[in-house]
Amino acid sequence: MINLAEYLLREFKEDTPEKSIKFFRSHGGFGYVIWLTILLKYFKKEALPIEDLVLSAEKYASRRTVVDFINKSSEGGYLLKIISNIDRRKVFIEPTSLTISEYSYWAAKFIDNVK
């Protein structure tokens, strides 16, 4: 338990070189919730409509703030917005390959350090 607490504290205080992780963590709790929600849905192979993502983070920031953050994430190359072929009004969110690879590296490092 001490290893976990020490690692989390050190990892939180240190500046990470991974651009996507730095971006999501720099926006407080809602950025972290958005990051983990997107990755969880991606690895579960479940579609994530933008509206569901907004609702998952509204507890931590205003709707406008969350929508702006999602737009910045997309513009920054960390998220993909995919328009539905069936209903053009529906937009889905997926992580980019950069976000996936940096998360995978971060997760492996995390697991190694808490053993």
Tell me the role of every PLM-derived stretch:
Residues E6-T37:
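Short alpha-helical segments that sit at the start of domains
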Residues Y32, L36-F43, E58:
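Short, locally clustered residues in the helix-turn-helix/winged-helix DNA-binding domain
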Residues K44-A57:
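Short acidic, hydrophobic short linear motifs in intrinsically disordered regions
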Residues S74-S84:
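A short, conserved structural fragment
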Residues I83-F92:
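Short, Lys/Arg-rich nucleic-acid/phosphate-binding segment
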Residues Y60-E75:
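Short amphipathic alpha-helical interaction segments
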Residues L98-K115:
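Short, amphipathic alpha-helical interaction segments positioned at domain boundaries
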